[in-house]
Amino acid sequence: MSLFDTINSGGAQLLGVAWPTVWALVRILVVAVVILLCVAYLILWERKLIGWMHVRLGPNRVGPAGLLQPIADVLKLLLKEVIRPTAASRWLYLVAPVMTVVPAFAVWAVIPFQAGAVLANINAGLLYAMAISSIGVYAVILAGWASNSKYAFLGAMRAAAQMVSYEISMGFALVLVLMTAGSLNLSEIVGSQQHGFFAGHGVNFLSWNWLPLLPVFVIYFISGIAETNRHPFDVVEGESEIVAGHMIDYSGMAFALFFLAEYINMIVISALAATLFLGGWDAPFEFLSFIPGIFWLVLKIFALLSVFIWARATFPRYRYDQIMRLGWKVFLPVCVFWVIVVGFWMMSPLNIWK
């Protein structure tokens, strides 16, 4: 019996009918707290890694080796005043930051951490994740419009066009995973990657979707970088032009909520990429299967997040027209072509997804 089953049965005996509600709230709270801690130390890891890439130390003053820097940053932002521009629409201005964070947290309801460990094991998990992720664009537009500033509105328009453009390519990538797995349930998608010739010989990582769907995996991940408005696709908040884009009139914790949503979305994109293309909690080799699955999932997410950071430290910012051209003239045609290729592949005698 697993630890979760032991807690579940013990709680059911103790609280009776109220236990399912209490257990659901406890799991949600634990996941939310862990995500917040991950975001705090992801920001520290980003600053450290970029520092090392620039041949410097990065934050090292607050606490041992700078480990308390995220706590200092949070306290600083908590103590800053939220200044609302006179011309801003009061309620919409305050709703926009919250509206960015809620969908970012909500996606975690369907992401499986290991076999049987998921908040909501629903059959339409992939569709749910895609639909909830799409809500973020409305919050960005709302923030730009409610500020009643032409610079914020320009940033919001850029963000909306960019996010919608790359969502189409990401959608096609998810359609291909659906075609090969035959299910929208994320746990079943992970399970579908645990079979095949290579998995039968103990080399599990060659059975994962990244290999047969390599171009789509690359497109999905790069589109994820664009979707989160991260460098080199950060024309939304180009420092040399409109500074913080749609966030330019925000301060204090309202400003921090936008950054919180951005970093949670980075982790979400990495978690979905690991689940859909990298076998989720599956170990790369059969002889390593004794290690808990959540370790492998976290390791894959960490590796993908490090690629996010590496891209920020390495590539120059794209121009707006280059971003649009890449999305519409490169990624979209490749995705459509790959849908046709995989369709014929699955109907041929060489179908590897049987």
UniProtKB/Swiss-Prot annotation:
Q: Which domain of life is it from?
A: Bacteria
Q: Where in the cell is it found?
A: Cell inner membrane
PROSITE patterns tied to this protein? COMPLEX1_ND1_2
A GO molecular-function term, please?
A: oxidoreductase activity, acting on NAD(P)H, quinone or similar compound as acceptor
Main subcellular localisation: membrane
GO CC term, one of those recorded: plasma membrane
Residues crossing the lipid bilayer are 25-45, 91-111, 126-146, 170-190, 205-225, 253-273, 290-310, 330-350
Task: Classify the protein's membrane topology as the record does.
Answer: Multi-pass membrane protein
Give GO terms for biological process. Answer: aerobic respiration
Keyword Cell membrane applies: yes
Entry EC number(s): 7.1.1.-
Q: Which reaction does it catalyse?
A: a quinone + NADH + 5 H(+)(in) = a quinol + NAD(+) + 4 H(+)(out)
Which keywords does the record carry? Cell inner membrane, Cell membrane, Membrane, NAD, Quinone, Translocase, Transmembrane, Transmembrane helix, Ubiquinone
The Swiss-Prot or TrEMBL record describes its family as follows:
Belongs to the complex I subunit 1 family.
- Quote the NCBIfam families the UniProt record gives: PRK06076.1-2, PRK06076.1-3
Assembly and partners are described as: NDH-1 is composed of 14 different subunits. Subunits NuoA, H, J, K, L, M, N constitute the membrane sector of the complex.
Main role?
A: NDH-1 shuttles electrons from NADH, via FMN and iron-sulfur (Fe-S) centers, to quinones in the respiratory chain. The immediate electron acceptor for the enzyme in this species is believed to be ubiquinone. Couples the redox reaction to proton translocation (for every two electrons transferred, four hydrogen ions are translocated across the cytoplasmic membrane), and thus conserves the redox energy in a proton gradient. This subunit may bind ubiquinone.
- Name of protein: NADH-quinone oxidoreductase subunit H
Q: Which organism is it from?
A: Burkholderia mallei (strain ATCC 23344)
Recorded name of the encoding gene: nuoH
